[in-house]
């Protein structure tokens, strides 16, 4: 992908510290994060440069919120929730504390991505999140075995028993957009949002005959796609590009109704004990050389300014093939989730799960 494409992405997002050695009692960072975001060589280099050990707990958005809620924000020094999952949980549970931006090397971030994330994670004038990894949800299709252009194609009768998706909120949102509605525009109207989610839930329940399985982890889906058991699925871009590297017939496609765009952040748990180590890790990770290593491990792009120049050319080419400029304009970036929205979605997902 050309560097101008990265600049273009940064422009779209607009519309939408402390380093060094630690004291003896502060030589450990307790990090809760996503799989593949903490490569061993990056941890080793951080330890060598700062003397700080990194204790990693792998998780996801729901588990992060649950763990931090259970402890009142204790147990970890740094968390990596998606940017849309910070303000709502903070309002409800008080599980985070504000960032001290004087301790962050903000010049290391893509300015527009930093501004967008700050905007979406600000509560009562205080910033709670900084951008790290970003990517999208869309369609992964074996183009030799199926033709799909939007999420609802996963329910086409000719692919009965050969498609997959997660039984999670992104699937509800994707099918809402595919129906021609904008679920994000209804976030502040719970009654209308509940009605839309109810309709979407019925659509997905009626589609269950097409679904081989609701995937729980990426390896489950990757293996199904490799064998041809799955011909089309809703999945993260990184999974699609990994499969494409193995089999050129498998493509990651930006759906007609729009890929869903997410940004995973850095956030400070309310009762973290080692903010100094957390800021050191943030600043270390946003260096272009380190960000490129993390990006290679995750298979996604980062908010680090200049890291794109060090990225794998193959990944850049895959991105360019998946996203025309029109498709980039059509990405639906997740806004902050207001309190109560996930309760509505949870009830719908339970009904889909129970449907025969």
PLM regions with names:
Residues 18-24:
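Sec/Tat signal peptide C-region and signal peptidase I cleavage site
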Residues 85-88, 234-249:
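A ligand-binding cleft/hinge motif common to bilobed small-molecule-binding domains
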Residues 76-81, 214, 231-236, 251:
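Paired acidic/hydrophobic, glycine-rich loop segments that form the ligand-binding mouth/hinge
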Residues 325-356:
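Conserved C-terminal helix/tail region of periplasmic/extracytoplasmic solute-binding proteins
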Residues 260, 264, 269-329:
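Mature extracytoplasmic/periplasmic domains
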Residues 80-222:
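Extracytoplasmic ligand-binding site segments that recognize negatively charged/polar headgroups
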Residues 25-89:
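Early extracytoplasmic/lumenal segment of secretory-pathway proteins
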């Amino acid at each position: 992908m050309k560097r101008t494409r990265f600049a273009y992405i940064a422009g779209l997002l607009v519309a939408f510290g402390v380093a060094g050695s630690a004291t003896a009692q502060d030589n450990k960072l307790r990090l809760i994060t996503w799989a593949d975001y903490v490569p061993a060589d990056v941890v080793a280099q951080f330890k060598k440069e700062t003397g700080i050990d990194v204790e990693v707990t792998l998780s996801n958005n729901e588990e992060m919120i649950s763990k931090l809620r259970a402890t009142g924000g204790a147990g970890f020094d740094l968390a990596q929730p998606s940017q849309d999952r910070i303000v709502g949980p903070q309002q409800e549970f008080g599980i985070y504390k504000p960032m001290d931006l004087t301790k962050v090397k903000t010049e290391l971030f893509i300015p527009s991505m930093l501004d967008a994330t700050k905007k979406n994670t600000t509560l009562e004038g205080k910033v709670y999140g900084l951008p790290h990894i970003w990517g999208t949800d869309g369609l992964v299709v074996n183009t030799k075995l199926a033709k799909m252009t939007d999420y609802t194609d996963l329910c086409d009768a000719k692919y009965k028993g050969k498609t997959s998706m997660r039984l999670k909120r992104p699937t509800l949102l994707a099918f809402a957009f595919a129906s021609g509605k904008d679920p994000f525009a209804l976030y502040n109207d719970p009654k209308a949002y509940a009605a839309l989610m109810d309709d979407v839930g019925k659509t997905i329940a009626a589609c269950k005959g097409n679904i081989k399985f609701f995937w729980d982890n990426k390896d489950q889906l990757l293996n199904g796609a490799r064998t041809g058991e799955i011909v089309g699925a809703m999945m993260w871009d990184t999974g699609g590009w990994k499969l494409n590297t193995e089999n050129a017939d498998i493509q990651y496609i930006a759906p007609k109704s729009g890929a869903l765009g997410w940004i995973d952040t850095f956030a400070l748990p309310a009762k973290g004990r080692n903010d100094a180590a957390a800021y050191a890790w943030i600043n270390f990770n946003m260096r272009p050389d380190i960000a490129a290593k993390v990006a290679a491990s995750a298979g996604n792009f980062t908010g680090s300014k200049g890291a794109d120049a060090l990225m794998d050319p193959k990944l850049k080419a895959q991105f360019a093939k998946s996203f025309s400029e029109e498709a980039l304009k059509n990405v639906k970036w997740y806004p902050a989730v207001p309190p109560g929205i996930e309760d509505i979605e949870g009830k719908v997902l339970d009904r889909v799960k129970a449907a025969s």
